[in-house]
Amino acid sequence: SVNPCCDPVICKPRDGEHCISGPCCNNCKFLNSGTICQRARGDGNHDYCTGITTDCPRNRYN
């Protein structure tokens, strides 16, 4: 299937888009800083998006 965020010729996000896929990417844009991207397993220390990357960095307290 064709990804609407991706320019298939150069395999990069289309002009005006931030990202193609990832846990902190939705509708071709980075999710806002502070958006939970990985729920904690009982300790309450969730992992959060940074707003500048598609990665979901691990909480430093995990």
Swiss-Prot record:
First-listed, main subcellular location of the protein, grouped into a coarse class: secreted
Protein location: Secreted
Disulfide-bonded cysteine pairs: these are C5-C28, C19-C25, C24-C49, C37-C56
Keywords from the named record: Cell adhesion impairing toxin, Disulfide bond, Hemostasis impairing toxin, Platelet aggregation inhibiting toxin, Secreted, Toxin
State if Transcription regulation is listed as a keyword.
no
Which Gene Ontology cellular-component terms appear in the entry? extracellular region
Q: Which InterPro entries match?
A: Disintegrin_CS (IPR018358), Disintegrin_dom (IPR001762), Disintegrin_dom_sf (IPR036436)
Citing just one GO molecular function, the answer is: toxin activity
Q: Where is the Disintegrin domain?
A: 1-62
> Record's SUPFAM superfamilies?
Blood coagulation inhibitor (disintegrin)
Regarding tissue, the record states:
Expressed by the venom gland.
Motif Cell attachment site: list the residue ranges.
41-43
Q: Name one Pfam family in it.
A: Disintegrin
Superkingdom in the source lineage? Eukaryota
Subunit comment: Heterodimer with subunit B; disulfide-linked.
Q: Which family does it belong to?
A: Belongs to the disintegrin family. Dimeric disintegrin subfamily.
Q: What does this protein do?
A: May bind to both alpha-IIb/beta-3 (ITGA2B/ITGB3) and alpha-V/beta-3 (ITGAV/ITGB3) integrins, and may inhibit platelet aggregation.
- The entry's protein name is Disintegrin schistatin-like subunit A
Q: Which organism is it from?
A: Echis carinatus
